[in-house]
């Protein structure tokens, strides 16, 4: 069975936090002190989690900023591998010892 690609952190936020709590994007934005557009773009995969947003989410949900940024980094790396991984392997060669 193939590994599933990592989910965008906004999808995780929407499915694992907002929906179970019955919380709207607007309510979360107000609780975090950020524009609603930031949360909307995030949960629709159109925006990345920044360190500022990670700190706010961590404080609100009782998690860590590293949790949120780690998810974003994993997602970003997988996207980069899909876009440019083969080209990099073909053109960048390991340094000889």
Question: What positions do the PLM features span?
Answer:
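Short, basic-rich loop-to-helix N-cap that marks the start of a DNA-contacting helix
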Residues: 46-59
